[in-house]
């Protein structure tokens, strides 16, 4: 599973609920690509955010792959004076880098020469490039460089979760690139027309699939049809509905709805019906006080690996039999309420996502 994540989205608390839950269950085969443009809504992120992101993901067992420099920058670093340029880039504050990006090549040149001084090799490296070439070099970050991205993806040879931190420029290639106000900024008609011309998109053909690309349409379509994402057909699966037979009817003395719910779930847990086999329960707080204890005692808690109930093994008196098992049908979430809603949504869509129907409770 691959997700593209904006760096501003890391402000959301449910991100960290998910990271902790993933660590609990030994999350595998998951990549998050963080679009690290360092701009959030109406401003630029705080200095040092990268370190916090890196350490947080590493704490939960993720591999961190940083895509900071594009191929143009990496080639420039190999030139005489390149190491001095790399050091300047690494030390440049995010706000200054964004402002210079918006101002363009002449501003880059003046700032670099002012701060680096006349150092021979690095001065020559800068002066060999036009303003346009210098701007292209300084904004050639790893997240915009397809060869760098492919090299990073192809370097992964395991199934552990990976966090790719891809440095980018917000609004890259547009007149608003780098400006702190670009989140709500709009290009004017003249700017849109210039962009359209630069991308070889003809008027009236804006919605054509391959408009502006150099390769013939039929060649591009053949390629896209053969890539694994499309070659396997639709990814929207389906599953048969679950028959409901002999649903438990609870009778007897007066009881609360919560107590009645618990008794219904216990009777289902005792049965071998198709309905009971497809139910997955969860609770964002205390499982026992929500009357799911009887269900869990019979259906166990889910975990990738079996874990015994040590209290039970040590003969500590308890009404609960808390055994973890890969076939368990209850997911323990602690008090992670946002995880609850994400789980309910994912389990409810399991027929479409995976071709197996689950009934989340």
PLM features: what roles do these ranges have?
Residues 23-24, 58, 157, 352:
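Anion (oxyanion) recognition and catalysis
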Residues 12-35:
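A short alpha/beta connector and helix-capping loop motif
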Residues 36-255:
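Long, well-ordered, tryptophan-enriched scaffold segments
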Residues 2-5, 13, 33-35, 65-67, ...:
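Generic beta-strand/beta-sheet core signal
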Residues 26-30, 61, 356-358:
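Short glycine-/polar-rich loops that comprise or flank the Walker A/P-loop
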Residues 1-2, 125, 130-140, 147, ...:
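Thiamine diphosphate
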Residues 17-23, 48-49, 179-182, 270, ...:
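Short, solvent-exposed amphipathic alpha-helical segments in soluble enzyme
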């Amino acid at each position: 599973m691959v997700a593209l994540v904006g760096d501003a989205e890391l402000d959301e608390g449910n991100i960290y609920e998910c990271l902790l839950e993933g660590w609990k269950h030994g999350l595998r085969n998951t990549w998050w690509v963080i679009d690290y443009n360092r701009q959030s809504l109406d401003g630029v992120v705080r200095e040092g955010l990268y370190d916090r992101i890196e350490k947080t993901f590493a704490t939960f067992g993720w591999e961190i792959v940083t895509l900071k420099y594009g191929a143009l920058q990496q080639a420039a670093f190999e030139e005489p004076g390149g190491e001095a340029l790399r050091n300047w880039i690494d030390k440049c504050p995010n706000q200054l880098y964004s402002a210079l990006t918006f101002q363009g090549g002449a501003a880059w040149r003046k700032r670099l020469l002012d701060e680096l001084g006349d150092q021979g090799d690095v001065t020559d490296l800068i002066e060999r490039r036009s303003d346009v070439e210098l701007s292209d070099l300084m904004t050639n970050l790893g997240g915009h460089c397809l060869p760098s991205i492919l090299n990073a993806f192809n370097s992964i040879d395991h199934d552990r979760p990976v966090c790719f931190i891809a440095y980018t420029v917000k609004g890259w290639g547009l007149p608003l690139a780098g400006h702190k106000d670009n989140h709500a900024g709009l290009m004017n008609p003249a700017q849109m027309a210039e962009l359209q011309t630069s991308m070889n998109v003809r008027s009236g053909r804006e919605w054509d699939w391959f408009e502006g690309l150099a390769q013939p349409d039929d060649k591009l379509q053949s390629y896209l049809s053969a890539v694994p994402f499309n070659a396997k057909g639709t990814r929207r699966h389906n599953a048969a509905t679950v028959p409901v037979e002999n649903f438990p009817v609870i009778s007897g003395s007066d009881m609360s709805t919560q107590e009645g719910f618990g008794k219904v779930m216990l009777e289902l847990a005792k049965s071998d019906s198709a309905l009971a086999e497809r139910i997955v329960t969860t609770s964002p707080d205390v499982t026992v006080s929500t009357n799911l204890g009887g269900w869990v005692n019979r259906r166990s808690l889910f975990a990738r690996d079996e874990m015994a109930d040590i209290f039970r093994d040590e003969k500590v008196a308890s009404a609960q039999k808390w055994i973890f098992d890969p076939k368990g049908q209850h997911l323990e979430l602690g008090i992670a309420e946002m995880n609850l809603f994400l789980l309910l949504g994912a389990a409810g869509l399991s027929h479409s996502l995976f071709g197996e129907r689950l009934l989340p409770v």
